[in-house]
Amino acid sequence: MSQANKIYFEDRSIVTPGDLIAEGEFQVPWSPYYYKVNGKYYSAITGLITVKDGSIFEVIPLESSRYYPKVGDTIIGLVEDIEIYGWVIDIKSFYSAYLPASSLLGRPISPGEDVRRYLDVGDYVIAKIEAFDRTISPVLTVKGKGLGRIPLGTVMDIMPVKVPRVIGKNRSMIEVLTSESGCEIFVAQNGRIHIKCANNLIEEALIEAINIIQSESHTKGLTERIRNFLKQKLGVIRNDSAPKTEANT
């Protein structure tokens, strides 16, 4: 980092709109959460600043329910409308996305073919952002392993900015959630989570744990607290559901 470059906040500090974050020339990607004026970077939101190696910074919104699309992101979308050649998909963004039928079918749609046979309003899909440049709506693709319609399980919503905390550093949090619950869990980058559990009680406990992560994401020691919470909660559930043996008389 150049001697002229300076970051004015420590890692994991809170910034508010108008705060001077840094000064100089930094190789940071475009973001809607800060702006640059005459070599000075200012926060556009109330958020958390992360600093890496003293030379790279990022501003993360503390409260945001909207997802900003990025090409290559894997998302969970909700079919909200049907068009002749594809589907309009809600991706929890200011933009609705479009999924061409040809991406799902692997061929062009035939004249008069009813695409509702493949996806209907209310269905969820796992997809990737294939194209987006802020001048057109995001275009999705479901070509690839693990992509396509979600047939089973539950989809829950969290704030997109909380996704990194639910996954955890080196996937530490998601591994705790998976190993303790035994559920299949997929966290999409737009703040939707697909879960499949053995029963509803385990699912409810897992959802409660994820909501705790979302509300306490800024606190330290959260991973171990979640591990202990699930051990206790699921231990009670599993003991209550275990077959009871009659005492000898």
Curated annotation (Swiss-Prot):
GO annotation terms (biological process): CUT catabolic process; exonucleolytic trimming to generate mature 3'-end of 5.8S rRNA from tricistronic rRNA transcript (SSU-rRNA, 5.8S rRNA, LSU-rRNA); poly(A)-dependent snoRNA 3'-end processing; RNA catabolic process; U4 snRNA 3'-end processing
Record-annotated S1 motif domain positions: 72-143
Highest taxon, organism lineage: Archaea
Coiled-coil stretches: none
Keywords assigned: Cytoplasm, Exosome, RNA-binding
SUPFAM superfamilies assigned: Eukaryotic type KH-domain (KH-domain type I), Nucleic acid-binding proteins, Ribosomal L27 protein-like
GO CC entries: cytoplasm; exosome (RNase complex)
SMART domains from the UniProt entry: KH, S1
Location, primary (coarse class): cytoplasm
Family, as annotated: Belongs to the RRP4 family.
Protein name (record): Exosome complex component Rrp4
Organism: Sulfolobus acidocaldarius (strain ATCC 33909 / DSM 639 / JCM 8929 / NBRC 15157 / NCIMB 11770)
Lineage, top ranks: Archaea, Thermoproteota, Thermoprotei, Sulfolobales, Sulfolobaceae
